[in-house]
């Protein structure tokens, strides 16, 4: 199988436009060649520092400038975070992800975050954090603490990005991804559907991800969760078939990545999620909350995966 980093927008758009059965057939064939299609990797996500963010991401309820009812909190204590990690492991999660609503981490907080990472690793779990923009030295410190994955999404295409965020550039995001990669940390990077973008923008997001020097090890695909008080409240919801198409094209263009169903899954039917798994999704977030928005209950996920004959890893 040839791994490519030279996808054109026209090629990706042609994949998105394929007849649905043909697209799923191609994606499923690649998925089976690279993974056991019965396995789903489970991650749990915890907000270790909520709200008060100075950024203006139009989808985000944690932005300080939007009145969304999210109260700003301080960075959690290490022992409280590790208690949550133990509970996540007991529930079946193999990776514990920690998110902080920062533009970038302050040096005074790095020691605490590194201690959290070390504690999660000591539990025998994979660790992931999302802390905003990083310097090269901060990325190295996280690596030294044992960090496995760093999440930093591109969100949308380079062309549409300015309609969603003005407080950091696309190049800022790419620079952080380069620091993470140079430090030897696995990259978790994806995007969000339902921001008002067009099909060309969705193709542009895939091109930006698939043409990185190395494909992300993890690619979260989110459907916008609309929150009252954010500028994107009232957007047209993403069509289910269009969402599945993006999962399939992510699988085709990034064969060895874990493609994760992320935000927005609570609103999906079991049948929609089954189509996503058929199209190549093989990771989900587990637990009733993703940072500040809802997520399916663990019992519902276990029941669905059991019905589908799939297993957690």
Curated annotation (Swiss-Prot):
Belongs to the radical SAM superfamily. Biotin synthase family. Its cofactor is [4Fe-4S] cluster; [2Fe-2S] cluster. One of its GO terms (molecular function) is 2 iron, 2 sulfur cluster binding. HAMAP family: BioB. Residues 38-262 form the Radical SAM core domain. The keyword Iron-sulfur applies. This is Biotin synthase. Pathway: Cofactor biosynthesis; biotin biosynthesis; biotin from 7,8-diaminononanoate: step 2/2. Catalyzes the conversion of dethiobiotin (DTB) to biotin by the insertion of a sulfur atom into dethiobiotin via a radical-based mechanism. Keywords: 2Fe-2S, 4Fe-4S, Biotin biosynthesis, Iron, Iron-sulfur, Metal-binding, S-adenosyl-L-methionine, Transferase. [2Fe-2S] cluster binds at residues 97, 128, 188, 260. [4Fe-4S] cluster binds at residues 53, 57, 60.
């Amino acid at each position: 199988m040839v791994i490519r980093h030279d996808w054109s927008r026209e090629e990706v758009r042609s994949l998105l436009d394929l007849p649905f059965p043909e697209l799923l057939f191609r994606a499923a064939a690649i998925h089976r060649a690279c993974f056991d299609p019965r396995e789903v990797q489970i991650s749990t996500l915890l907000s270790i520092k909520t709200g008060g963010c100075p950024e203006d991401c139009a989808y985000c309820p944690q932005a300080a400038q939007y009145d969304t009812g999210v109260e700003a909190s301080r960075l959690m204590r290490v022992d409280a975070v590790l208690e949550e990690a133990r509970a996540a492991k007991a529930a079946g999660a193999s990776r514990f992800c920690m998110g902080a609503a920062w533009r970038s981490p302050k040096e005074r907080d790095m020691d605490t975050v590194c201690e959290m990472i070390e504690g999660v690793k000591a539990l025998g779990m994979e660790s992931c954090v999302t802390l905003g923009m990083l310097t090269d030295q901060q990325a190295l410190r996280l690596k030294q603490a044992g960090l496995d994955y760093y999440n930093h999404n591109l969100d949308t295409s380079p062309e549409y990005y300015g309609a969603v965020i003005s407080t950091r550039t696309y190049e800022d995001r790419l620079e952080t991804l380069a620091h993470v990669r140079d430090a030897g940390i696995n990259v978790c990077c994806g995007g969000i559907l339902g921001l008002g973008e067009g099909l060309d923008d969705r193709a542009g997001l895939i091109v930006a991800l698939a043409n990185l020097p190395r494909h992300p090890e993890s690619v979260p695909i989110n459907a916008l969760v609309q929150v009252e008080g954010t500028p994107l409240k009232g957007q047209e919801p993403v069509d289910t078939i269009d969402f599945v198409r993006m999962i399939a094209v992510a699988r085709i263009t990034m064969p060895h990545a874990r493609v994760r169903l992320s935000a927005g899954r609570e609103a999906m039917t079991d049948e929609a999620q089954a189509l996503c798994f058929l199209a190549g999704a093989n990771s989900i977030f587990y637990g009733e909350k993703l940072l500040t928005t809802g997520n399916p209950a663990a019992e519902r996920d276990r029941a669905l995966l059991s019905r589908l004959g799939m297993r957690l890893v």
